[in-house]
A protein has these predicted regions:
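Active-site loop segments of alpha/beta catalytic cores
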Residues: 1-68, 72-315
Protein backbone atom coordinates (compact mmCIF):
# COMPACT_ATOMS: atom_id res chain seq x y z
CA UNK A 1 0.00 0.00 0.00
CA UNK A 2 1.21 3.49 -0.86
CA UNK A 3 0.77 6.42 1.54
CA UNK A 4 -1.84 7.79 -0.89
CA UNK A 5 -3.99 4.67 -0.53
CA UNK A 6 -3.71 4.86 3.25
CA UNK A 7 -5.08 8.39 3.17
CA UNK A 8 -7.86 7.50 0.75
CA UNK A 9 -8.99 4.68 3.02
CA UNK A 10 -9.49 7.20 5.82
CA UNK A 11 -11.18 9.82 3.62
CA UNK A 12 -13.62 7.14 2.45
CA UNK A 13 -14.26 6.17 6.10
CA UNK A 14 -13.33 2.55 5.44
CA UNK A 15 -12.35 0.28 8.31
CA UNK A 16 -8.70 -0.76 8.12
CA UNK A 17 -6.56 -3.21 10.13
CA UNK A 18 -3.94 -0.51 10.60
CA UNK A 19 -3.48 2.61 12.64
CA UNK A 20 -4.96 5.74 11.05
CA UNK A 21 -2.84 7.78 8.64
CA UNK A 22 -1.35 11.10 9.69
CA UNK A 23 -0.42 14.49 8.29
CA UNK A 24 -0.29 18.17 9.21
CA UNK A 25 -1.60 21.18 7.33
CA UNK A 26 1.83 22.69 7.90
CA UNK A 27 4.96 21.19 9.40
CA UNK A 28 7.31 24.11 9.96
CA UNK A 29 10.10 22.26 11.79
CA UNK A 30 11.88 20.92 8.72
CA UNK A 31 15.08 22.78 9.56
CA UNK A 32 15.31 20.94 12.89
CA UNK A 33 14.13 17.65 11.38
CA UNK A 34 15.99 17.61 8.07
CA UNK A 35 18.43 20.50 8.13
CA UNK A 36 16.35 22.07 5.33
CA UNK A 37 13.94 24.96 5.56
CA UNK A 38 11.02 25.79 3.31
CA UNK A 39 11.34 28.71 0.94
CA UNK A 40 10.18 32.14 2.02
CA UNK A 41 8.83 34.97 -0.09
CA UNK A 42 12.19 36.68 0.25
CA UNK A 43 13.96 33.68 -1.31
CA UNK A 44 12.04 34.13 -4.56
CA UNK A 45 12.16 37.90 -4.84
CA UNK A 46 13.88 38.99 -8.06
CA UNK A 47 14.57 35.33 -8.96
CA UNK A 48 13.35 33.89 -12.24
CA UNK A 49 14.05 31.28 -14.88
CA UNK A 50 16.33 28.35 -14.09
CA UNK A 51 17.25 29.70 -10.67
CA UNK A 52 13.60 29.95 -9.65
CA UNK A 53 12.91 26.43 -10.94
CA UNK A 54 15.85 25.12 -8.88
CA UNK A 55 14.50 26.75 -5.73
CA UNK A 56 11.04 25.27 -6.35
CA UNK A 57 12.68 21.87 -6.94
CA UNK A 58 14.42 22.14 -3.57
CA UNK A 59 11.09 23.06 -2.05
CA UNK A 60 9.45 19.95 -3.54
CA UNK A 61 12.31 17.77 -2.32
CA UNK A 62 11.83 19.09 1.21
CA UNK A 63 8.14 18.18 1.07
CA UNK A 64 9.03 14.65 -0.06
CA UNK A 65 11.75 14.14 2.54
CA UNK A 66 9.47 15.33 5.35
CA UNK A 67 6.57 13.15 4.20
CA UNK A 68 8.81 10.08 4.01
CA UNK A 69 10.46 10.69 7.38
CA UNK A 70 7.16 11.36 9.17
CA UNK A 71 5.11 8.74 7.26
CA UNK A 72 2.57 11.27 6.04
CA UNK A 73 -0.17 10.16 3.66
CA UNK A 74 -0.61 13.69 2.27
CA UNK A 75 1.73 16.37 0.97
CA UNK A 76 0.18 19.81 1.24
CA UNK A 77 1.71 22.48 -0.96
CA UNK A 78 1.56 25.68 1.01
CA UNK A 79 -0.16 28.77 -0.40
CA UNK A 80 2.90 30.44 -1.83
CA UNK A 81 3.64 33.13 -3.35
CA UNK A 82 1.81 32.79 -6.67
CA UNK A 83 -0.51 30.17 -8.10
CA UNK A 84 2.03 29.52 -10.86
CA UNK A 85 4.68 28.67 -8.26
CA UNK A 86 2.29 26.26 -6.57
CA UNK A 87 1.47 24.56 -9.86
CA UNK A 88 5.15 24.29 -10.77
CA UNK A 89 5.88 22.74 -7.36
CA UNK A 90 3.07 20.24 -7.91
CA UNK A 91 4.47 19.29 -11.31
CA UNK A 92 7.92 18.75 -9.81
CA UNK A 93 6.44 16.64 -7.02
CA UNK A 94 4.64 14.44 -9.54
CA UNK A 95 7.89 13.92 -11.44
CA UNK A 96 9.83 12.95 -8.30
CA UNK A 97 7.54 10.44 -6.62
CA UNK A 98 4.90 12.73 -5.18
CA UNK A 99 2.16 10.66 -6.78
CA UNK A 100 2.71 8.13 -3.98
CA UNK A 101 1.05 10.71 -1.72
CA UNK A 102 -2.22 12.60 -1.78
CA UNK A 103 -1.14 15.94 -3.20
CA UNK A 104 -3.06 18.68 -1.45
CA UNK A 105 -3.41 22.44 -1.85
CA UNK A 106 -5.54 25.34 -0.63
CA UNK A 107 -8.56 27.00 -2.24
CA UNK A 108 -11.07 28.67 0.07
CA UNK A 109 -12.64 31.91 -1.10
CA UNK A 110 -15.20 32.29 1.66
CA UNK A 111 -15.20 35.01 4.31
CA UNK A 112 -13.14 34.22 7.38
CA UNK A 113 -12.70 35.94 10.73
CA UNK A 114 -11.31 39.38 9.81
CA UNK A 115 -8.18 40.61 11.52
CA UNK A 116 -8.47 43.20 14.24
CA UNK A 117 -7.99 46.18 11.95
CA UNK A 118 -10.80 45.14 9.60
CA UNK A 119 -13.26 43.48 11.94
CA UNK A 120 -15.58 46.40 12.68
CA UNK A 121 -15.58 47.59 9.08
CA UNK A 122 -16.54 44.09 7.93
CA UNK A 123 -19.44 43.61 10.34
CA UNK A 124 -20.78 47.12 9.67
CA UNK A 125 -20.74 46.38 5.94
CA UNK A 126 -22.97 43.34 6.47
CA UNK A 127 -25.60 45.67 7.91
CA UNK A 128 -25.07 48.75 5.74
CA UNK A 129 -24.32 47.22 2.31
CA UNK A 130 -25.52 43.60 2.36
CA UNK A 131 -26.25 43.42 -1.37
CA UNK A 132 -22.79 44.68 -2.27
CA UNK A 133 -21.20 42.24 0.18
CA UNK A 134 -23.15 39.34 -1.32
CA UNK A 135 -22.15 40.32 -4.85
CA UNK A 136 -18.50 40.47 -3.80
CA UNK A 137 -18.78 37.13 -1.98
CA UNK A 138 -20.28 35.46 -5.04
CA UNK A 139 -17.61 36.76 -7.39
CA UNK A 140 -14.83 35.85 -4.96
CA UNK A 141 -16.26 32.36 -4.54
CA UNK A 142 -16.17 31.86 -8.31
CA UNK A 143 -12.52 32.90 -8.35
CA UNK A 144 -11.82 30.32 -5.65
CA UNK A 145 -13.48 27.64 -7.74
CA UNK A 146 -11.33 28.59 -10.73
CA UNK A 147 -8.23 28.45 -8.55
CA UNK A 148 -9.21 25.01 -7.29
CA UNK A 149 -9.83 23.80 -10.84
CA UNK A 150 -6.35 24.83 -11.91
CA UNK A 151 -4.82 23.01 -8.95
CA UNK A 152 -6.85 19.89 -9.67
CA UNK A 153 -5.86 20.00 -13.33
CA UNK A 154 -2.21 20.18 -12.21
CA UNK A 155 -2.55 16.95 -10.21
CA UNK A 156 -3.92 17.91 -6.81
CA UNK A 157 -6.36 15.32 -5.44
CA UNK A 158 -7.32 17.02 -2.17
CA UNK A 159 -8.34 20.64 -1.65
CA UNK A 160 -8.18 22.17 1.80
CA UNK A 161 -10.49 25.04 2.71
CA UNK A 162 -8.94 26.83 5.66
CA UNK A 163 -11.05 29.93 6.32
CA UNK A 164 -11.60 30.13 10.08
CA UNK A 165 -15.20 30.74 11.09
CA UNK A 166 -15.10 30.31 14.86
CA UNK A 167 -13.62 31.76 18.01
CA UNK A 168 -13.12 29.62 21.09
CA UNK A 169 -16.59 30.66 22.23
CA UNK A 170 -18.39 30.04 18.94
CA UNK A 171 -18.83 31.33 15.36
CA UNK A 172 -17.88 34.93 14.59
CA UNK A 173 -21.29 35.32 12.89
CA UNK A 174 -24.58 33.87 14.07
CA UNK A 175 -25.56 30.68 12.23
CA UNK A 176 -28.26 32.62 10.37
CA UNK A 177 -25.83 35.32 9.23
CA UNK A 178 -23.28 32.62 8.40
CA UNK A 179 -25.87 30.98 6.13
CA UNK A 180 -26.47 34.23 4.26
CA UNK A 181 -22.97 35.63 3.91
CA UNK A 182 -20.78 32.52 4.00
CA UNK A 183 -22.72 29.28 3.92
CA UNK A 184 -24.24 29.52 0.46
CA UNK A 185 -20.83 30.26 -1.07
CA UNK A 186 -19.13 27.58 1.02
CA UNK A 187 -21.65 25.05 -0.31
CA UNK A 188 -21.15 26.28 -3.87
CA UNK A 189 -17.39 25.95 -3.67
CA UNK A 190 -17.41 22.52 -2.02
CA UNK A 191 -19.82 21.12 -4.60
CA UNK A 192 -17.86 22.55 -7.53
CA UNK A 193 -14.56 21.17 -6.26
CA UNK A 194 -16.10 17.75 -5.76
CA UNK A 195 -17.66 17.88 -9.21
CA UNK A 196 -14.13 18.42 -10.54
CA UNK A 197 -13.10 15.19 -8.81
CA UNK A 198 -11.32 16.46 -5.69
CA UNK A 199 -11.66 15.40 -2.09
CA UNK A 200 -12.37 18.38 0.17
CA UNK A 201 -11.06 18.95 3.69
CA UNK A 202 -12.62 21.81 5.66
CA UNK A 203 -10.50 23.38 8.39
CA UNK A 204 -11.66 25.82 10.99
CA UNK A 205 -10.39 26.40 14.50
CA UNK A 206 -12.60 27.29 17.42
CA UNK A 207 -15.92 26.04 18.73
CA UNK A 208 -17.55 24.64 15.59
CA UNK A 209 -20.45 22.92 17.33
CA UNK A 210 -23.12 25.53 16.38
CA UNK A 211 -22.08 25.12 12.71
CA UNK A 212 -21.21 21.41 12.74
CA UNK A 213 -24.19 20.13 10.76
CA UNK A 214 -23.89 22.98 8.26
CA UNK A 215 -20.20 22.30 7.66
CA UNK A 216 -20.79 18.60 7.09
CA UNK A 217 -23.98 18.95 5.03
CA UNK A 218 -22.03 20.67 2.26
CA UNK A 219 -20.59 17.28 1.36
CA UNK A 220 -17.00 17.69 2.55
CA UNK A 221 -14.92 14.54 2.89
CA UNK A 222 -13.08 15.53 6.07
CA UNK A 223 -13.25 18.04 8.90
CA UNK A 224 -10.16 19.51 10.58
CA UNK A 225 -9.17 20.53 13.38
CA UNK A 226 -11.75 19.47 16.02
CA UNK A 227 -10.22 22.03 18.37
CA UNK A 228 -9.91 20.84 22.01
CA UNK A 229 -8.61 24.26 23.06
CA UNK A 230 -12.13 25.53 22.25
CA UNK A 231 -13.70 22.64 24.16
CA UNK A 232 -14.64 20.56 21.11
CA UNK A 233 -14.79 16.87 22.08
CA UNK A 234 -13.79 14.55 19.26
CA UNK A 235 -15.75 11.70 20.81
CA UNK A 236 -18.93 13.76 20.58
CA UNK A 237 -18.17 14.92 17.04
CA UNK A 238 -17.51 11.31 16.04
CA UNK A 239 -20.85 10.29 17.53
CA UNK A 240 -22.74 13.06 15.75
CA UNK A 241 -21.21 13.06 12.26
CA UNK A 242 -18.59 10.31 12.11
CA UNK A 243 -20.78 8.28 9.77
CA UNK A 244 -20.73 11.13 7.23
CA UNK A 245 -17.30 12.70 7.39
CA UNK A 246 -13.71 11.79 8.18
CA UNK A 247 -12.26 13.61 11.20
CA UNK A 248 -8.73 15.02 11.33
CA UNK A 249 -6.68 16.25 14.26
CA UNK A 250 -7.68 17.09 17.84
CA UNK A 251 -4.31 16.47 19.51
CA UNK A 252 -3.98 19.51 21.76
CA UNK A 253 -1.50 21.99 20.28
CA UNK A 254 -1.12 23.84 23.58
CA UNK A 255 0.05 20.60 25.16
CA UNK A 256 2.42 19.99 22.25
CA UNK A 257 3.90 23.43 22.68
CA UNK A 258 4.20 23.45 26.45
CA UNK A 259 4.19 19.82 27.60
CA UNK A 260 4.62 17.92 29.80
CA UNK A 261 4.81 14.60 27.95
CA UNK A 262 2.11 13.14 30.16
CA UNK A 263 -0.38 15.73 28.93
CA UNK A 264 0.61 15.13 25.30
CA UNK A 265 0.09 11.41 25.82
CA UNK A 266 -3.33 11.90 27.39
CA UNK A 267 -4.53 14.05 24.49
CA UNK A 268 -3.08 11.75 21.83
CA UNK A 269 -4.48 8.59 23.36
CA UNK A 270 -7.91 10.17 23.73
CA UNK A 271 -7.98 10.94 20.01
CA UNK A 272 -6.82 7.47 19.01
CA UNK A 273 -9.23 5.75 21.38
CA UNK A 274 -12.33 7.74 20.45
CA UNK A 275 -11.82 8.67 16.80
CA UNK A 276 -10.05 5.66 15.27
CA UNK A 277 -12.66 2.91 15.77
CA UNK A 278 -14.72 2.34 12.66
CA UNK A 279 -12.29 4.20 10.39
CA UNK A 280 -12.66 7.75 9.15
CA UNK A 281 -9.93 9.35 11.26
CA UNK A 282 -6.60 10.98 10.38
CA UNK A 283 -4.25 11.56 13.30
CA UNK A 284 -2.80 15.02 13.77
CA UNK A 285 -2.62 18.17 15.83
CA UNK A 286 -5.54 20.54 16.22
CA UNK A 287 -3.84 23.10 13.98
CA UNK A 288 -0.33 22.86 12.53
CA UNK A 289 3.16 22.09 13.77
CA UNK A 290 4.50 25.62 13.70
CA UNK A 291 7.82 27.12 14.71
CA UNK A 292 7.81 27.19 18.49
CA UNK A 293 6.57 23.63 18.98
CA UNK A 294 9.51 21.59 20.31
CA UNK A 295 10.40 18.93 17.74
CA UNK A 296 10.87 16.36 20.49
CA UNK A 297 7.27 16.88 21.61
CA UNK A 298 5.95 16.35 18.10
CA UNK A 299 8.09 13.25 17.63
CA UNK A 300 6.74 11.94 20.94
CA UNK A 301 3.21 12.49 19.64
CA UNK A 302 4.11 10.46 16.54
CA UNK A 303 5.69 7.70 18.64
CA UNK A 304 2.36 7.21 20.42
CA UNK A 305 0.70 6.93 17.02
CA UNK A 306 3.26 4.37 15.88
CA UNK A 307 2.59 2.29 18.98
CA UNK A 308 -1.17 2.31 18.37
CA UNK A 309 -1.13 -0.22 15.53
CA UNK A 310 0.69 -1.53 12.47
CA UNK A 311 1.43 0.54 9.38
CA UNK A 312 0.37 -0.62 5.89
CA UNK A 313 3.63 0.89 4.61
CA UNK A 314 5.56 -1.77 6.51
CA UNK A 315 3.45 -4.79 5.49
Amino acid sequence: MKPRDWGLTALRREVMPYRPPTFELEMQLTEELLGRRYLTLEDLQAVSGAERHQLLTERAETYLLAAERLQYAFIRVRFFPTLEDEIETIRILRQRGGEDYLLTAEADNTFRIPDGNEYLQFVYSLKDWPDEVLEYASNWCDKGIKRGKRLIDAGVEVITMCADYCFNNGPFLSPEMWDRFIGQFYYRQVRALKDYGAYVIKHTDGDIMPLLERLVDAGIDALHSIDPIAGVDIAEVKRLVGDRVCLIGNVDLAKLQQGPLEDIEASARYCLEHASPGGGYIYGSCNSIFEGVPLENYMYMLSLWQESGPSPLES
